Amino acid sequence: MALVLNDRVRETTTIVGTGTATLLGAATGYQAFSTIGNGNTTYYCISDQGGANWEVGIGTYTSAGTTLARTTVLASSNGGALVSFTAGTKDAFVTYPSEKGVWLDSSGNAIGLGTPAAFIATNVTGLPLTTGVTGTLPVANGGTNITSYAVGDI
């Protein structure tokens, strides 16, 4: 199904171990995971209420039994692996992992991720526009087979 994100989604769970979390209902002032939709995936965080054990990942919500399957762990207090939670109440909420974010500057422009130092282009389509190029481009290669043109030549 679809990856769905919603704001202010938070429930509690008493999950023990590394399995699927049974969700116990929305915290006061928050929405339930049901807003994600049955069978859809979402980014989640599960954290014990002391904050020592936590996990961020991609989970699948199921309305039958109101569960969240911990499908893919993106980061955790267990070195990026599933956390084996111990007894007690945990918070489960929708989050947006920093590694999935698009970084914007203060003007709202995407921050460049750098330019490759060198690369080999293969199977490139289109005609790059370059200044200072002379000669003709044959018609078979998308050109007009002329070195200059006047109004009406094209």
What are these regions (language model features)?
Residues 2-7, 14-154:
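Extracellular repetitive beta-rich solenoid segments
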